[in-house]
Structures are given as structure tokens and as C-alpha cells.
Amino acid sequence: MENRPAFNKTKIVATVGPASNTYERLGILMREGVDVFRLNFSHGSYEDHLSVINTVRRLNKDMRTSVGLLQDLQGPKIRLGEVEGGGVEIKGGDRIKLVCGEQEISTATRLCTIYLGLARDVKPGDQILIDDGKIELKVLATDRDKEVDVEVVYGGLVKPRKGINLPDSEVSAPSMTEKDIEDLKFGLEHDVDWVALSFARKADDIRFIKKIIADSGKKTRVVAKIETPDGLRNIDEIIAVADAIMVARGDLGVEVKMEEVPMAQKMIIAKCNAAGKPVIVATQMMESMITAPRPTRAETSDVANAVLDGADAVMLSAETAVGAYPAEVIRSMVGTILSVENNSPQLFHRWWPVNAAAPTFMADSVLSAACHLAKNTGAKAITGMTHHGYTAFQLAKYRPKANIFIFTDNRELLTVLSLVWGVRSFYYDRLISTDSTVADIRYVLTTTGHLETGDLFINTGSMPILDKGTANMVKVSVA
């Protein structure tokens, strides 16, 4: 892989849409600094998504890059159905009905949702929020079957197919809908690198999707999206079984009090950092750049604070999917990330205790030692050999200031690691001896400009190299 000699360690995930879905536009975004492209399965046809998948892979080949693909499943999003006249006005104090599972058109006195379980899930006094909280209803009564009597607390224009949030209720909808399962099969068939499960509420939700993946004979990694109170309550068990976490601040900011979201973000990031699991911060990071060529000061600060919190990646949604300035968004985000990383020593050298009881104790100790050694010697790089990726995830966990370069004989891993903090990957399969591998790594990193003559770098790997065992070796080398 041909890498940029200077690069941001915090990765960028960009959503693809009409503003960015051609070979030329995707190529521009990759050159500006996108690490992973998100395919939003709430929108678009399979034909649209397959075109993007094929185009990104063609660009990776043409540009000698390893940009990854993240499939984002829609999840059990509760929505209204169609609305009379394209929109009806409801006013505060109105008493109306919310009807479940009906295909009839909503009116100002009778709103209809396609979700069958709503009347069973709510109880008197519960909040019901529509359109990201713009409209608030209070439950007066429910027949526990099809109809809910509600009072309008904050009214407004009700538009078709807007989302419904139930922040006070235990939602009984399954973690994956039939649509999600079919969409997942499509993603697995086309070998996406990551799949994001929306509205993850408990560990069993992750186990369910992982079983589908395993039964398909795939090893696709799962991102759990935290966007409900249940997800927050069960965060520890979710982190334990997920491969990565997304702080999905859009629905989360509706489901819990908006003022609680910043601290929830910090809490989730801290737990993911300690567990060595990648964490993505998403939603409205540079929202104003949908229509403006520059971000607001608040948006720049939001991106900077996500980096300072320890996010592995920051994500863009409408900004790159439908916005007028997708390339400028990436350029601005890269600039902010680099500014923070170049001026924040507290970002680096995060030392976590090694668990002596863990089956990975030896490898963990070696990789921790490699990061300590890099800090103490001022090494410019840490290199690792891995087939499954464990070495890369562990090295990133310690947030070394030295650049992390991973060499692997597993081509699929190259794009998977595009999401992981600080990691840049190279394909390498000339496994002859440890000495020859170190010499090859030195050659690759010097010819690509990542090391200069005389630079120290730290090698980690397993000896003998042909056994492809766990990491058991640390070596200081000179370029």
C-alpha cells in the first residue's frame, strides 16, 4: 500500500450518497483522507450499493490504497406511515390517537405507525417523540393492542415516514428486521469489511448477528451502534462481544437527555479504549457544511474534542452523502485532527495493565513492551506482522506516538484495519526468515518515505516467522 508520509492517526469515515458516488468523486475523497466509506442501508438500492463497493475496490487497486467499507444496517427504526397531504399540523394540548400497524394515511387526529408493537411497549405517562424530538406526545392510555391515546405536548408539522422514539419505554422490536437480515446477506456476499448493527441494546443482539455471519462462513466484524438507554445501560456487555462501537449521537440525543450525550460519549470512548476496541463518534460533526464551504467554530471544536476523548474514528453522514462540499469537509476534518494530534501530548502513550490471567498474556506483554520501547528510544515507527489482526488492535490500544505499520499476508485484513487508530497496513507474504522480513520492512518504509536513514524503528512479531504464532519478539532496528 502506498501511504501518505504524514497522516492523521484518528480515522475518517464518510457516508456515500449522490454527492459522492462516482469514481471521480470517491477518488477525490480518498485523496483528501477518507479511510472508510459507509454504505447507509436506510437508503439506496442494492444496485447503488454494489456500484459503490466495486468502485471503491477499483480505486484501491488504481491508487494502491486500502480504504475500507462499512455496511450500516437500518435496524428496527419505528416510523410513521404516509401522511395526508404530505403533512398535517398538530398543536400543543390536542388529544389524538396513535394507531399501530395500520396502512391508512395519518391525519391530524389519527397518526399511524407501521410498528405493530408500539401499543404494547408504552404505558401512561411515557414520552413519544417524532422527527428527532421536534414533536412530543405524552401517553394517556393504551389498549395494549393497536391504539394509544396521546396528548400533544409540543406540536408542529407531521411529515410522512418520520422516525418515532420511545425514550421511556422498553422497545420489544427485534434487534434485526427481515430487511436487515436480507441486507446483511447482501453485504456478506460482497465482502464488506464491517457491518454496523443499529439500536444495539444488549450483548445477545451482537451474538445474533455474529451467528448469522459465522453461519455464512464469513468473518465480517461487527460495530454496535449505541443509540438507546438500554444500549447505554448494557454498554459493558456490548463492548465485550462487539468488535467496535459507534456513538450514534443522533438517536441517542433523542432517546436520552441531550445534555447527557457529551458525557455518555466520553464514557463509551474511555471503556472502548481500555478494552482495545475501536470506537467511532458519529452524527452532525460538520452538519453546516452540507450547505456551507466552512464549518462552524462549534463543529471544529466537536471534532477536536472527539479526537481528544480518544475516538478511533470520526464519521460524516449527510455532509459527504448529499452535501455541496464533500471534499472540503474531509480537508477541514483532516486539518482539525492533525492540529489536535500535533499539539496534544496527552493523546499518546496510554498504558493499560496487562492481564496475567488472559490467554493472550504473552503477546499482550510483548506488544506493551514494544510501545514502551518506542517511547523510551524515540523510535519513529512500530511494525507488526499479523494474520488475524490482533497485533494491530493491541498496538493501537496503547496509542504510541510512533507510527504503526502492519504487514500481513491476509489481503482482507488490509481494509479491515483502515478503521483502527494510527494503523497503516501493507501486504507482505515473503515469509522466509525474521532477518529477511526486518530487512524487507526497512526497505518498504524507507522507499515510501515513512522512515529516513538512521531512524529507529521497533519490530514485533513471532519467531520462528514461518510458524505464524503469537507475538513473542521485540527488536530495535535502524533504518
Where does each model-flagged region fall?
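Non-catalytic helical/linker scaffolds that mediate oligomerization, partner binding
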Residues: 1-479
